[in-house]
From Swiss-Prot:
InterPro entries: BsaZ-like (IPR006307), T3SS_substrate_exporter (IPR006135), T3SS_substrate_exporter_C (IPR029025). One of its GO terms (cellular component) is plasma membrane. It comes from Yersinia pestis. Residues 1-20 are annotated as: Disordered. GO terms for biological process: protein secretion. The chain crosses the membrane at residues 30-50, 79-99, 138-158, 163-183, 187-207. Keywords: Cell membrane, Membrane, Plasmid, Protein transport, Transmembrane, Transmembrane helix, Transport, Virulence. Pfam families: Bac_export_2 (PF01312). Gene3D superfamilies: secretion proteins EscU. The gene is yscU. It is a multi-pass membrane protein. This is Yop proteins translocation protein U. It is found in: Cell membrane. Coiled coil: none annotated.
Length: 354
């Protein structure tokens, strides 16, 4: 049936949806980008964070000999400073990655439609529908699958290091830190891989749902096409496109002509004749009215002679065909034009020699 939404959305439908803030996006992509970036940062700057975290822990003990009021002021100032050193790089990277992950998914987008107040959003009935909708159920199932997958991955890491963990009490303080660091790195790597897989699958699902929601019926596509056909903007662009093509073709036609026969502002006929190459003169173009002025301008730019012959121009316009030899009835008049052209070429050669 023509009313069923079985057709892929048109580019216009996608553009209109984008203006309203409707784009294919996955929250998991953002989460994964943040986790990967912050994990890599913590691993790469582990010495930096260990140093500042150690300073943070030692600040109260370092000022224990001072009076309470002095020690309190010093501790508060330095604790805040160390918190800044610890948090600022993480927050900066998190903000940049959040922006980048959105841009990667759907480019730069600022939509006023998405932030407009909507009475449906505060309607309790509509709110209940959203809570118990299929989409909410799918989100709930995705969360469960994510927890299950990550739990399995963590269990694999712990099981693989179970013997090492059981030996920690007898290992001594010297080996606890490197062993725990090794296990922590394994957990970060395996969880990162898990999150990447989850985000790819989730984006594919969200894109599928996005296209499904935008699908159109055949009637909608026909209606959109009719609206676009009648749009002044589309008509203007189409007219401009045709004019550009016509202008390019006109210049090519004038360039390959030997002479232009005009009448003088209403008709322009192009004639091509090369002795030894064309057995008879050939009509290269026929233009009328407003196009004649453009032909004259192009001919002057390209150095193609223009000759005013009103009877011949009219006869060729009515009797001759483009890219065909001139009719027999106009041979004599055309020969006169070609003799004039030959005299012009001879005079031009003489003037160049002088």
């Amino acid at each position: 049936m023509s009313g069923e939404k079985t057709e892929q959305p048109t580019p216009k439908k996608i553009r209109d949806a984008r203006k309203k803030g409707q784009v294919a996006k996955s929250k998991e992509v953002v989460s994964t980008a943040l986790i990967v970036a912050l994990s890599a940062m913590l691993m790469g700057l582990s010495d930096y964070y260990f140093e500042h975290f150690s300073k943070l822990m030692l600040i109260p003990a370092e000022q224990s000999y001072l009076p309470f009021s002095q020690a309190l002021s010093y501790v508060v100032d330095n604790v805040l400073l160390e918190f800044f050193y610890l948090c600022f790089p993480l927050l900066t990277v998190a903000a940049l990655m959040a922006i980048a992950s959105h841009v990667v998914q759907y480019g730069f987008l600022i939509s006023g439609e998405a932030i407009k107040p909507d009475i449906k959003k505060i309607n309790p009935i509509e709110g209940a529908k959203r809570i118990f909708s299929i989409k909410s159920l799918v989100e709930f199932l995705k969360s469960i699958l994510k927890v299950v997958l990550l739990s399995i991955l963590i269990w694999i890491i712990i099981k693989g290091n179970l013997v090492t963990l059981l030996q920690l009490p007898t290992c001594g303080i010297e080996c606890i830190t490197p062993l725990l660091g090794q296990i922590l790195r394994q957990l970060m790597v395996i969880c990162t891989v898990g999150f990447v897989v989850i985000s790819i699958a989730d984006y594919a699902f969200e894109y599928y749902q996005y296209i499904k929601e935008l699908k159109m019926s055949k009637d909608e596509i026909k209606r959109e096409y009719k609206e676009m056909e009648g749009s002044p903007e589309i008509k203007s662009k189409r007219r401009q496109f045709h004019q550009e093509i016509q202008s390019r073709n006109m210049r090519e036609n004038v360039k390959r002509s030997s002479v232009v026969v005009a009448n003088p502002t209403h008709i322009a006929i192009g004639i091509l004749y090369k002795r030894g190459e064309t057995p008879l003169p050939l009509v290269t173009f026929k233009y009328t009215d407003a196009q004649v002025q453009t032909v004259r301008k192009i001919a002057e730019e390209e150095g193609v002679p223009i000759l005013q012959r009103i009877p011949l121009a009219r006869a060729l316009y009515w009797d001759a065909l483009v890219d065909h030899y001139i009719p027999a009835e106009q041979i004599e008049a055309t020969a006169e034009v070609l003799r004039w052209l030959e005299r012009q070429n001879i005079e031009k050669q003489h003037s160049e020699m002088l």
